[in-house]
């Protein structure tokens, strides 16, 4: 059972980094696609006026507290989140686990060349990764079909999406 709180009707998991990594690893064995979002104050405020984003955040499999503003808001509501789970830190922790367990990873998003450099940087930091694909965040509708096929055909268990809010959230939700 998930322990969540609500900030302006946006669910946020009360979770530590260690628990978040474990939860993602558990999601690998569950059928279907899963969405993990990193909730910060900007997303909470945007969701107040963007019904699509609001629905996506509410339906995510995990919504980690990414930002001091989220922790502060929880305290103002008389609730406590044990720690900030920043998206970039979560990505590093998940990639460390992926390196150890040879989990297939797909890097998706950012400007051309950025994801490739991210792979090099991460491998220098944590060791070899089983990268099954890389694609920048610039694509048309036909390429989108090919990207989805590459992710599926490559058997990626972890897809890191860096497209900027609200595009990555919308993208991962629509493809789930």
Description of each model-found segment:
Residues 1-84, 88-89:
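N-terminal nucleotide/polyanion-binding subdomain common to many enzyme families
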Residues 40-41, 110, 163-164:
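Short, well-ordered beta-to-alpha junction loops that form the rim of enzyme active sites
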Residues 61, 132, 157:
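Conserved acidic residues
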Residues 63, 107, 160-161:
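Conserved SAM-binding loop
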Residues 72, 166-168:
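Short glycine-rich, flexible loops that bind phosphorylated cofactors or substrates
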Residues 74-150, 154:
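Conserved beta-alpha
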Residues 157-165:
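Periplasmic-binding protein-like
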Residues 172-176:
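Conserved small/polar residues in nucleotide/adenosyl-binding loops
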